[in-house]
Amino acid sequence: MDQSEALQILKSGRSVFLTGQAGSGKTYVLKEYIKFLRGKGKLVGVTASTGVAATHLDGMTIHAWTGMGILDNLTKKDLKKIIKKKGVSLRIRNAQTLIIDEISMFSAGHLDIAEEIIRYARGTWEPFGGMQVVFCGDFFQLPPVNRCGVESMGKFAYHSRAWKELKPEVCYLTEQYRHKDQ
């Protein structure tokens, strides 16, 4: 599909996995969608799995946004401590859309942790607390780094419970824009 089709699907409010090869315009579509949402007065959680990717969108890491930091598992004690952080819980409760760029670098286990924090903070058991979620990235890149040896931390995010429950619509961008500009 082209960028305008993907934008229309995003504007419908559905949760989406935005993907395509390098140069297909994923970042452009995200930036346009963020601009659209903010123009409507919507609060957007703009995140990425890495700090570098987050800075490209003027966002923050998903680890910081959810307050999960470097946790590889989540205890009830951890969850309560995270939710007590006023900035984190307000940010999560007030966001209407969550964007996670470079999803290929975020493991299944970490996505489940982030999603559990979001549900708890929002007080609802709907996937991601009922907010629209936009995953963006290309799973043909390297898998997540597994620092701790836990199996779920080495699996791609689409293997997570959170992804399977959300059932995001796939928007595969097929047109090459980077090469057209040269």
Residue ranges, per PLM feature:
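Conserved ATP-binding/catalytic motifs of P-loop helicase motor domains
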Residues: 1-182
